[in-house]
Amino acid sequence: MRASLENGDDHDAHRLVDAGFRPPGRPRAARRRAFARARRGERRARGTAEDRHDVPGAEQPVLRDDAKGARRGGRVDRRAGDRHRRASRREQAGERRRGHAAEEDRHPAREPDRFDGHPVGRRVGEEGGRRRRRGGRERERPGRRVRRLEEFRRGRDVVRLPREGDRRRRRSRDPRRHPGRADSRARARLPRGAREIPEREDRRRAERQAGARERARRHREHDPGAPVAQGRLQRQRRRLDGRAVRDRGVGPRHQAHERRRRAGGDRGDAEAELEVHRDVRAVPARPDSPRDRHRAREEVGRQCAEGDSGRREADRQGQREDVQLVSGPRDEADDMDEASGAARAPDEASEEAMDTILALTGITKRFPGVVALRGIDLRVARGEIHALLGENGAGKSTLMKILCGIHPPDEGVIALDGEPRRFANHHDAIAAGVGIVFQEFSLIPELNAVDNLFLGREWRGRLGLRERARMRRAAADIFARLDVAIDLSAPVRELSVAQQQFVEIGKALSLDARLLILDEPTATLTPAEAAHLFGVMRELKRRGVAMIFISHHLDEIFEVCDRITVLRDGQYVGTTEVARTDVGALVEMMVGRRIEQSFPPKPRLARDAAPVLEVDALQVRENGPVNRFALREGEILGFAGLVGSGRTSSALALIGAKPARVRRMRVRGRPVCLADPAAALAAGIGLLPESRKTQGLIPAFSIRHNIAINNLGKHRRLRWFVDAAAETRTTLELMQRLGVKAPTPHTRVDTLSGGNQQKVVIARWLNHHTRILIFDEPTRGIDIGAKAEIYQLMRELSARGYSIVLISSELPEIVGLCDRVAVFRQGRIEAMLEGEAIEPNTVMTYATSDVRGANHEHA
């Protein structure tokens, strides 16, 4: 055998390689040459000149593997035997195919007609195989036509063989996707009994189409013009994806008939019907281009801004009558203005409608178990300051959150500049030009004012780096317009509450919004700071910016606003102009009743009553002033002054929540050292903080847990367990006593209104039997009705022997509620006013000047 390999006997070498023989001891180069000669002989024995597509006698090229092996310096592939075995199997398959081809030549009549001029040899060749080149190597395998032909001869059900190029067409094989032209290949794969399935589907589809034509014929007999117009209207609505406005209560077809009836004619043609449907806020049929679709949407928005017809017009008429009854009699000049307005030309009316920047129509919002808004309508003109009034829980904040994209409306349309809009999130509202200053701060305490101002929209240069200097200059310009001094490098948590409010306002102004929503912006501002804000608002008004102003201070409403819209219990009450109403009428619209007196009468207190709290020396900061004062039993002592004058700092240092340089005091004649709030709590002193949501309550807890958290040992069972039933009974008693409006004691406290939340904080201290209470801005963010309840509650507590310190920025509260007033200025008590001396002018004089009064007492 070795001799045959050395002599180059290709036939013997081929047999040995097929058997897997690997001759040992042979030089590598000799083995390589022997295997190369064996493979060349195999190719010559397997194929013909025609199959190889070259002329007879031509020398065969060296295979890529052999050439690669030669370049490698004679290294022999160890898997050559496996390759030769595969080659022999391919040769046997070729012999079988050649036998089939010879059988076909002997019986040409058995070839089916459905080949349609595409003989098998066209794809198969004489040997019946397909030649492929992969990696420079010739391979042969049976073609697809040969396999299908073999299946046909074996009796399988083959409808037709695929033609040339079917592999590249990639058509769907599911007849249901193309019912008009079912794929025959998919039907060919079905069993014989299931071939009528596509035909059955075709019959059913034809029956459905016939039924639709019959219904259309019957409908045409009833109303000849309706089917075409109705079909077009449906296509238009589908094309708008639900953006077309539909009138509530009455369908478009009924309105079309009503309009035709009032017009005095019965036009039955399709174009007249389509014209009527266009009046019902449809767009022109089949827009030809995106520009036409854009014009169609503008037309829809313009019609939205002009107002609804039918029931909406009647509702507004009734609301105008209600507002006229509330506002009182009108003079002849008003009647003449109304008559002239009624006689205006249609062009002027349309110009006024186009001046509307915001139109809310039928806004309805439902939450689990409650309907927050019911069909709210609101119109805001360009360059107008529009006030939105209502009690806590009336739906003002919910309506503004819908307008800002925080909550989606369940019903209704929002039209901005005459175009229907639907905001998916708050970023969409900002991009549309809607800015808002929330009642709760949306600032990040760890960032400074500049970063909070441009958070999420930082200015970046060419390399993507933030332009800090440019943003800092812009922030400085914004705060200069607000006329407020803010440290731009300090974190926001180190700023006062009033400064944080100005940062919120500056953040909204930096958006260049065309519609600005201000939700209680003056709640933390002094009158002077509020006056600065009103000046900024008037400047924005002159620039054409529309503003929605939400406030519980009616004097601010009458000072800066143009029109007022009132909500009550989630429903629209009415809209009136500021010049045509008064405070009493607005309060009655908000509350539903007339409030005669806000502040309860002051009792007469004995001047020689024993003090319950005596502060001998209180120095908050180093080298600062030292204050002394006393608090009597059953007295309401007011701390008045501007924001930053030291009122809140003194109160926090009093209970140990803030460090103090000097703190000497006595409680009921006994010296105490209040180093922390726990010591103050043990001494019977409690604080109702300025921000009740972040400092006074745990929002995720229930009413019962918030009330009982200061006194967990009161209802203890078996020393380690809390008696939940006893806590619930105590909570119910306090809720009834203070008038907390909530379904159950287990209601989450963050779902309550501001007034009820403040009552929960008061109930916590009453549960602890604390006799000295410090109220820091107790009526901030509370409507006028809840304010009256808080005032009455404070007076009742003082009548029961509770001593109260009231810190407030509202002069009417200080003057109307306090028995004595300590006026602070720059951390010092400038004056102690009592009795008739408590007047607004006197308080402001001591708060803003360096003059001390003759009645400057500290006891």
UniProtKB/Swiss-Prot annotation:
SUPFAM superfamilies given in the database record: P-loop containing nucleoside triphosphate hydrolases
Regions of compositional bias (Basic and acidic residues) in chain numbering: 8-17, 44-80, 89-129, 137-167, 193-214, 239-250, 263-281, 288-301, 308-323
Enzyme class: translocase
EC number: 7.5.2.7
Membrane-spanning residues: none
Gene3D superfamilies for this protein: P-loop containing nucleotide triphosphate hydrolases
Molecular function in Gene Ontology: ABC-type D-ribose transporter activity; ATP binding; ATP hydrolysis activity
Region named Unknown: 1-353
Chain residue ranges for the region called Disordered: 1-351
Localization (cell): Cell inner membrane
A Gene Ontology term for the protein's cellular component: plasma membrane
Compositional bias ranges of the Basic residues kind: 28-43, 168-179
InterPro entries: AAA+_ATPase, ABC_carbohydrate_import_ATPase, ABC_transporter-like_ATP-bd, ABC_transporter-like_CS, P-loop_NTPase
Topological type in the membrane: Peripheral membrane protein
Domain ABC transporter: 358-594, 607-851
Keywords of the record: ATP-binding, Cell inner membrane, Cell membrane, Membrane, Nucleotide-binding, Repeat, Sugar transport, Translocase, Transport
Subunit structure: The complex is composed of an ATP-binding protein (RbsA), two transmembrane proteins (RbsC) and a solute-binding protein (RbsB).
Family as reported in the entry's similarity comment: Belongs to the ABC transporter superfamily. Ribose importer (TC 3.A.1.2.1) family.
Family matches, as PANTHER family: CARBOHYDRATE TRANSPORT ATP-BINDING PROTEIN MG119-RELATED, D-ALLOSE IMPORT ATP-BINDING PROTEIN ALSA-RELATED
Protein's name according to its UniProt entry: Ribose import ATP-binding protein RbsA 1
Gene (name only): rbsA1
